[in-house]
Amino acid sequence: MATKKTIITKDQIVSMYMNYVLEHSEKPKSVYHFTKINDFTETEFYAFFGTIESIEKEIFKMFVDKTIDLLNKNKEYELYDMKGKMLSFYFTFFEILTANRSYVVLVLKEHDNQLKKLMQLSGLRNSFRDYLSEIITDDFRTQQEKLQNFQEKAFLEASWIQLLLTLKFWL
């Protein structure tokens, strides 16, 4: 009788990846190597991820998604103002990071190149920006419009003063 193989999920792959990185202090050399030591196929891997780097991006995105899911489970969260929602987000997000601190510190301190860190956090950035778009209120937009009007007036006056100073220098 043949044994029935269980279907692997995206979350399981992410968990195996995080464990691998923590145990070896480096990312796997290849998809083949990673799938072989974790006893699943490359086809199963490629059903969710295109590269090893895409898992890294997905992990931080998943931290944001988990944060938002936890916040939305709280019935009172919908009643919070924008500031309250942001504070709740930060608190919950950093609690999730704390729960995964060893992994987060290892992968973010791995790169001296800031650009590589930014690339790794691109999924987090996109999810965070989407979250912000959802919680921005009309009051905030009105305040921003007032601020933009003020900035425009300040720019016009500063430019006028700059022209006067340049004229004075020219004389």
Feature annotation, model-predicted:
Residues L79, R141-Q148:
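Acidic/His metal-coordination segments adjacent to aromatic residues that form catalytic metal sites
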Residues E58, K73-L106, N113, G123, ...:
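Hydrophobic alpha-helical connector segments
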Residues M16-E23, K66-L70, Q162-W170:
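Solvent-exposed, amphipathic alpha-helical segments
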Residues K10-M18, Y46-N72, E76, K83, ...:
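An amphipathic alpha-helix adjacent to DNA-recognition modules
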Residues K117-Q143, K153-L167:
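Amphipathic alpha-helical packing segments from all-alpha helical-bundle domains
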